[in-house]
Amino acid sequence: MKHRIVTAAQMKEIERAGDAHGLPYLQMMENAGIAAYAELQKQFSHPGRLLVVCGKGNNGGDGFVIARTAAKDDWNVTVLLAEGEPKTSDAILNFERLHSLPVPICTDCSVLETQHFDAAVDALYGTGFHGEPVSYTHLRAH
């Protein structure tokens, strides 16, 4: 698959055009999460322990899709809500879909001190990020 780099504004326009032509934002989120999980699978020969660090926006929603897909594929998944519960409707829906699976949802970073993970997914910020970068030194690697 050939990839091209686009700006945040171009990505927003691509998504808007997709939605206008019958590809809903929720389906785009599903597709993005499944594609990201497929990349993760290429790095591991068998399921392990996965940490998915999610933000409160649509990038976090992508993370919830990754977590759900991995859990259904026998990964031991933990989700860390780094900024609290999701705020966008599509992210909320994908967050709620996790509740039927054995996926612990944490808001306390102490999970990083008490558990070992084979892989971690950063689903904090995407193209909608604005403002000053936030320091997540409490999410440091161990």
Regions found by a protein language model. Give the residues of each.
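Conserved small/polar residues in nucleotide/adenosyl-binding loops
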Residues: 137-142
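Glycine-rich, N-terminal phosphate-binding loop of Rossmann-like dinucleotide-binding domains
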Residues: 54, 124-125
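Active-site-proximal loop->helix
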Residues: 61-105
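Positively charged, low-complexity intrinsically disordered leader regions
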Residues: 1-46
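Glycine/threonine-rich flexible loop motifs
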Residues: 125-136
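Structural motif
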Residues: 49-51, 119
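Short amphipathic alpha-helix with an adjacent loop that forms part of the alpha/beta core around
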Residues: 109-116
